[in-house]
Amino acid sequence: MNAYIERVIEDVKRRDPDQKEFIQTVEEVLRSLEKVVEQHPEYEKTALLERLVEPERVVQFRVPWVNDAGEVKVNRGFRVQFNSAIGPYKGGLRFASHVNQSVMKFLGFEQTFKNSLTSLPMGGGKGGSDFDPTGKSDAEIMRFCQSFMTELYRHIGPNVDVPAGDLGVGGREIGYLFGQYKRIVNAYENGVLTGKARSFGGSVIRPEATGYGAIYYAENVLKHDGETMEGKTIAVSGFGNVAWGVCKKAAQLGAKVVTLSGPDGFIYDPDGVITEEKISYMLEMRSSNRNRVQDYADKFGVEFFPKQKPWGCKVDICMPCAYQNEIGMKEAQQMLDNGIKYYIEVANMPTTNEALFFLMGKGVTVAPSKAVNAGGVSVSGLEMSQNSERLSWKAEEVDAQLHNIMDNIYAASVEAAEKSGLGYNLVAGANIAGFLKVADAMMGQGIV
């Protein structure tokens, strides 16, 4: 391994020994860049990697709010502005109990390369809070969002930092956040947030975009082997917007998603989540705030497996859509035992490094999350363009641009890996392609 890369990784571990998620993503990315770094000695001379792994800014703040019982609650808010070399910081807001600085830094670091892959002018950032919206009333969520934005507004803007949604933050939350921002700054800057409702500057197919993009990317992977999505069975985890988009686009292309999962277990639907009724019901489940996938089994009369994960099901493609590190060695072995051929990461870093390299070593085609799930931020970027132009594009136009972006991300990843002598390696290829654009911009802007 390259001595410079190892030194940078060790420095990260020394500085932030408790930030396991951040260390994991730094190791995975940097170790795939060995050949590129060897070809560019100027990177070490200018401490490029040291600058790359250090966020430009980390903001942490308290978020006090009042629940329906009149009790004052206090949560932590975060915004990690990781890298602005190629554009304003861009990345989602996550509201979940597991949110901490390590999770925010890992997501912001990944976002930097993901945004680079889209070829749109967006830097990398991420934010959120350890506030858990599950079981909260609409009024409580509104009050929390207003308090959160009362601090966040100081650090964002259409040309500075443009947040969006993520886990626990959907269209409702974005609306509350935008309303409070508008009230505080006394200006209608609808480019400050993406993922908005259509009525105040949102883009068509933004809620579905991550799932749509994942299927478009998977199409390219299958095409490489002379196959199509037609007739393929897919195991999916989660049942939120990402899984919903995957189900919709997979059904349109003749494939079928046969599993969904939640904290309570998973469902197996052999007929597939393919009808409009089933796909629409996923949104009802999510908006209920109950966080139970068993409701789907009860409604449609399919099997429910409590407290289990769906990776033991025999399918053609596995697409984890839930949360980081949901796939460890146990789950990877289950997939392998069932003859899995394609493993398409959709959630952010859903696989431990050990499981990731295990699957790759066993000949499974692995597509990395930073490339696969770039559809969401791509359409966010297109929403920013529409806001700047004060226009609203048609669904067909947005979908066509999304499809083109995902095709280009796949092609760039393949080309980058091949140029580095790594063969057909989508994981390394995505890291290299995303890194090179950011590195070139950082080198051109001096030591900042």
Roles of regions detected by a PLM:
Residues 2-25, 221-222, 336-448:
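Adenosine-phosphate binding glycine-rich loop
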Residues 3, 7, 17-24, 28, ...:
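Conserved active-site and cofactor/substrate-binding residues in soluble primary-metabolism enzymes
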Residues 20-23, 39-46, 119, 156-165, ...:
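Flexible, glycine/charged-enriched surface loops at secondary-structure junctions
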Residues 42-73:
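Structured beta-strand/loop patches that form or line metal/cofactor-binding pockets in enzymes
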Residues 96, 115-230:
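Glycine/serine-rich phosphate-binding loop and adjoining beta1-alpha1 elements at the start
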Residues 202-314:
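Glycine-rich phosphate/diphosphate-binding loop of Rossmann-like nucleotide-binding domains
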Residues 265-366, 371:
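Rossmann-like adenosine-cofactor binding region
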